[in-house]
Amino acid sequence: MGKKQHIAIFTTASLPWLTGTAVNPLFRAAYLSKDGERDVTLVIPWLSLKDQALVYPNNITFASPSEHEKYIRQWLEERVGFTSGFSIKFYPGKFSRDKRSILAVGDISEVIPDKEADIAVLEEPEHLTWFHHGKRWKTKFRLVIGIIHTNYLEYVKREKNGQMQAFLLKYLNNWVVGIYCHKVIRLSAATQDYSGSIVCNVHGVNPKFLEIGKKKREQQQNGDQAFTKGAYFIGKMVWSKGYKELLHLFKNHQKELSALEVDLFGSGEDSDEVQKAAKKLEMAVRVHPARDHADALFHDYKLFLNPSTTDVVCTTTAEALAMGKIVVCANHCSNEFFKQFPNCWTFDESKGFVQLILKALAEEPAQLTDAQRHDLSWEAATERFLKAAELDKPFEKKLSRSTSIYMSTSLNLQQTVDDASAYVHHVASGFEISRRMFGAIPGSLKPDEELSKELGLSDSGRK
């Protein structure tokens, strides 16, 4: 038997912040390590108490990394139903208020000792490497796989001078991802394109949603009415997360949809404005605070509406399908993966949106087969990841005799270009002035005394 693969998964966020880059890499680590064939380490940011208070909900904070790890493992075990065998390590991070995200401090690749460095998975590689100053990822690890979660270009386009910012960011992202990743997996075609990248949804749904869907299927098979409620939408309550499109569609088709009752669930900076807009409609649209999508409150809804085109792969759409519901969503590349499921109905224009809603109200959802349910699971997502990353076969680097000289010369030239490019980035990321120019948090070149003490870093690690 060959040597076990050691996979280190680096990500940009952590529970209890329920964002995609906190939740999905955690499930990935659990399912990659489930069969015991790989050694898996999840590497997540550690924040000072001050930053924890800004990021984590419900006043949850942790006095130590061990306390934080205990919380994460308990949360995970409650959802997957098995004890995970992966390890958790922390890297120093700081919260950027203006970017609303956590940025790494220092060389986070040092968290994995050189003797253990084998395969690195960078969840949001552009985010993790914008300001990276340290050992080159491709040098330290045999294989570096980047997973693109977010379309940062769409976010910056909404800011002041957005078009120019997006233009510059596109080239910065291409630069750092090319320098630091061997392979790039994009969750959908709604992300920025990268040279040599492949599109593959390597995410699954929380097993709880599949259990809910299984019970609903049993009710349908027994002839019971499984879905007694109408339509709903759930998501962070900001206009860009689908609320703008949804309320616009309702406003333009109030007469046709007069019999429809819709519940909107979410919290966010646009909550008050969404509520005001909903009240102006001549149809029943109720606005509620955010709730966990697995809450029993949602089980009996038949129809999930999601006209958003700003997601890369919408988690709530996957969850609704797993629960056996009909989903009406936009015919958009972010929903391409979901089109294989019989309950995913897509529309191109507002007329189609109305027709699908009326059809859904008159029909019952199709019962998902076991194979379709499997495709939504983390087991299937893990299979897709291993195949896309080519980790399901032995690692080999062989050149045929006829092409070896040409290929060797070509690879050497490419290596020289990559090395030069990496050197330029290393130099630029080593000066406070240039780091600040590109948006780094002041003083993030190395961990401060507080972070070093909390993580038990040596003085040499801070130099």
Curated annotation (Swiss-Prot):
A Pfam cross-reference name: Glycos_transf_1
Keyword Glycosyltransferase: yes
InterPro entries: DGDG1/2, Glyco_trans_1
Signal sequence residues: 1-22
Tissues and organs where the protein is expressed, per its UniProt entry: High expression in nodules infected cells, and low in nodule and root vascular tissue.
Record key words, sorted: Chloroplast, Glycosyltransferase, Membrane, Nodulation, Plastid, Plastid outer membrane, Signal, Transferase
Record organism: Lotus japonicus (Lotus corniculatus var. japonicus)
GO biological process: galactolipid biosynthetic process; nodulation
Gene behind the chain: DGD2
One function term, GO molecular function aspect: digalactosyldiacylglycerol synthase activity
Record flagged with keyword Plastid: yes
Domain of life of the organism encoding this protein: Eukaryota
Catalytic activity: a 1,2-diacyl-3-O-(beta-D-galactosyl)-sn-glycerol + UDP-alpha-D-galactose = a 1,2-diacyl-3-O-[alpha-D-galactosyl-(1->6)-beta-D-galactosyl]-sn-glycerol + UDP + H(+)
Family the entry assigns: Belongs to the glycosyltransferase group 1 family. Glycosyltransferase 4 subfamily.
Cellular component aspect of the GO annotation: chloroplast outer membrane
The protein, known as: Digalactosyldiacylglycerol synthase 2, chloroplastic
Function: Involved in the synthesis of diacylglycerol galactolipids that are specifically found in thylakoid and in nodule peribacteroid membranes. Specific for alpha-glycosidic linkages.
EC code(s) of this entry: 2.4.1.241
Subcellular location field: Plastid, Chloroplast outer membrane; Plastid outer membrane
